[in-house]
Amino acid sequence: MDTLASNSSDLTTKSSLGMSSFTNMYLLTTLQALAALCFLMILNKIKSSSRNKKLHPLPPGPTGFPIVGMIPAMLKNRPVFRWLHSLMKELNTEIACVRLGNTHVIPVTCPKIAREIFKQQDALFASRPLTYAQKILSNGYKTCVITPFGEQFKKMRKVIMTEIVCPARHRWLHDNRAEETDHLTAWLYNMVKNSEPVDLRFVTRHYCGNAIKRLMFGTRTFSEKTEADGGPTLEDIEHMDAMFEGLGFTFAFCISDYLPMLTGLDLNGHEKIMRESSAIMDKYHDPIIDERIKMWREGKRTQIEDFLDIFISIKDEAGQPLLTADEIKPTIKELVMAAPDNPSNAVEWAIAEMINKPEILHKAMEEIDRVVGKERFVQESDIPKLNYVKAIIREAFRLHPVAAFNLPHVALSDTTVAGYHIPKGSQVLLSRYGLGRNPKVWSDPLSFKPERHLNECSEVTLTENDLRFISFSTGKRGCAAPALGTAITTMMLARLLQGFKWKLAGSETRVELMESSHDMFLSKPLVLVGELRLSEDLYPMVK
């Protein structure tokens, strides 16, 4: 019996071992089959991707080094925008691909390609890159303009579009804008009456800064005292200088943006500049914002008077504040920074061009006199009829853009543009410089000719929907307030022309129309001598 039991046990054990061995072999075979299947799928995907890239290659561009790509050349060739445009000229292309680290940078100078990207595929290119500068300015991506695509961007974009820059708000704040335009005129009057030279760059930047501060905070100055002639205080000058410093480095091809492991080493010096400029702006903004939030919470303020009040008072579905202080502060900083550079640059260049071409200046003043007369100053209600003045501004936007490129648009997935493969994560740079000077689009592109923008059948507008040049950017990431930009820019130029005759100081008769070596601004600030053009009793006084 024991022998039988033993034999039975041996058989059971052998059977069990056999089953176990069979099971293990089955599992192993299954795993091998799955692994082989996965390998084939990956191989097929690689082949498909390779086939796709053969069918749709990357845009033309240099090969670059492993890992770093063209970063050595980027560091060697400054400013980078001139290097990129010279590369495109050498390659004879209107779309290129330059790899910086692992990022494909895609500059575009062709309106047709630009429309394909920003009109036909706008949603796909709706994101922003993650950069050190943008992280600092946006307080960790809590804003709208420079925040990558996602729920936070959609939330802030909705707030700005429905509550801040809607037509009703634009009309509501008309009187504030009008007062700032009168203040500009009074400030210029005082300088001209005192025979002071007028630095047009200084004046135009501070007018734009005053206008946006007035709309945002209800005041044009950060100082308790004001200058008697209407000019900015030392505090306002420090704020404006920090703002333009920050603007210059918001997107400046910082090496750590393409090689993130270098963040903190600050090899370009960009990180320190951004921290310091942002801190100066915060120094002036944050106390006002904190005090205003406290007033609303304590019931000491109940009336909405400016944009800051709107941000604080917006409620969510539960009746609670929709925005936190950590969202309000960087959003206000972002909007304040977005206002001054484009209008002030366009007006400075426009007047410089007109000093050299007095026939254009004469036509502009003739139009203002015809539309407005000489018994009152131009107002926003006159803008629709000032077509030649607006044509001058359009031409300044075209030929003398404030920046070489728009902020980068990041591709959310692989796509094809103009027959080229654009990988996910690519940064598309729409070239203001290249679009406006494209000889395939513009005849005699380097000449300043406002007449090219006139159309007898329709009113001239500052927006350019066909992307032949950039005035205010378009699409999901476009300028949120073209109406405000139009009002500020047109009123500034119209008041400068209507109220004053301008000439160069001394014996000079021509402006040297040269761009700065490191950006797109006029190489030297435009300094002029003015003369009153209207009856003295029409000029407003500083309040």
Swiss-Prot record:
Belongs to the cytochrome P450 family. The chain crosses the membrane at residues 22-42. Keywords: Heme, Iron, Membrane, Metal-binding, Monooxygenase, NADP, Oxidoreductase, Transmembrane, Transmembrane helix. Pfam families: p450. The gene is CYP79B3. It comes from the Eukaryota. It is a single-pass membrane protein. Converts tryptophan to indole-3-acetaldoxime, a precursor for tryptophan derived glucosinolates and indole-3-acetic acid (IAA). This is Tryptophan N-monooxygenase 2. The lineage of its organism: Eukaryota, Viridiplantae, Streptophyta, Embryophyta, Tracheophyta. GO terms for cellular component: membrane. The keyword NAD does not apply.
